[in-house]
Swiss-Prot record:
It holds the Pfam family Ribosomal_L19. This is Large ribosomal subunit protein bL19. Keywords: Ribonucleoprotein, Ribosomal protein. One of its GO terms (biological process) is translation. It comes from Chlamydia muridarum (strain MoPn / Nigg). This protein is located at the 30S-50S ribosomal subunit interface and may play a role in the structure and function of the aminoacyl-tRNA binding site. InterPro entries: Ribosomal_bL19, Ribosomal_bL19_CS, Ribosomal_bL19_sf, Translation_prot_SH3-like_sf. Disulfide bonds: none annotated.
Length: 121
């Protein structure tokens, strides 16, 4: 029974998504329906957490805009998610970056991972 559920979840998972980790800055493009029209909306932020696995995996992004911190969660395997692009790789030593919530300005930044390790990641 467990194998059947795993096979069904593997069928529903998308394979076109790029690999990213917590601390990376990514750009997520989603389809938005407004008044009978569809458009693509882009949200760029730092990955705070990845939760779940398989078809129900979610990612939480954090961004500071106009002095206010905002968070948005995305279901990775949703058909509304058009694309995910890695802007820069971050160097962190935590699996969850919830300490970014109260920070603004330079304190809310994550160090950038540069060099050959950034390309391998």
């Amino acid at each position: 029974m467990g194998n059947l559920i795993k096979e069904l979840q593997d069928e529903q998972c998308r394979t076109d998504l790029v690999d990213f980790c917590v601390g990376d800055t990514i750009r997520v493009a989603t389809n938005i329906s407004e008044g009978g029209k569809e458009r693509v909306q882009v949200f760029q932020g730092t990955v705070m957490a990845r939760k779940g696995g398989g078809a129900g995996e979610t990612v939480s992004l954090h961004r500071v805009a106009y002095g206010e911190g905002m968070e948005k969660s995305f279901l990775l395997n949703s058909p509304k998610v058009v694309s995910i692009e890695v802007v820069k790789r971050g160097k962190v030593s935590r699996a969850r970056l919830f300490y970014l919530r109260g920070k603004t300005g330079k304190a809310a930044k994550v160090k950038e991972l540069i060099g050959p390790r950034a390309a391998k990641k």
